[in-house]
Amino acid sequence: MRLSTSTNLYNFDRSVPYQLSMEDAMRVCRDAGYSFLDANFCGMSRLGKKEAPMTLDDWDERVRSWKVLADRTGINFRQAHAFFSVKGSITADALPDGEFGEEMMRRSVLAAEVLGVEWMVVHPVNILTDGHNDPEASFRYNLEYYGKWAEFFHAHHVGMAIENMLCGGRHNNVWADIDRLCALVDAIGRD
């Protein structure tokens, strides 16, 4: 059995998130006995945080340095988490976090390719209609949105794993419904 943890496990303190570098997270996780890690690009893509290397001009150099460190220390990145918006539901005419979000998603895929990631998690978004999450509109939006990204993932040899979301907060998350999530995965049709 292979046990894995995420690089943000070590890096996440809700009162002061993303204060520690990816390099430190890798070293501490390796010292704790983990050789398989989930590269959390989402956590490394948050503007205004102390550690947000995916937002920097030299992001690709940082990623290559993570690969060198991983190879030197015996770490394997079999999975990752792509950038995703934490701002909540959007309208059907919007992009999750706009052009910034699109660039962070692109960088996540390219970084995953460099690190040898086999599967990268993405999170579907909820679409608001008349101030409420709309399951049908959300399905259509995510089918088009992640269908587009599936081509880019595939071109860079990274599998896309669409992960469910918890239900809670101001609006119920339509992606907490496992049947809806499975239907989306089947409709996109990529592995």
List each model region and its residues.
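N-terminal pre-domain/capping segments
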Residues: 1-118, 136-137, 147, 153-154, ...
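Charge-rich, low-complexity amphipathic helices
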Residues: 50-52, 91-93, 127, 133-135, ...
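Distinct, well-ordered alpha-helical segments
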Residues: 18, 133, 139, 166, ...
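Hydrophobic, well-ordered secondary-structure segments
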Residues: 139-146, 150, 159-160, 164-166, ...
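Active-site groove signature of glycoside hydrolases
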Residues: 112-134, 156-168
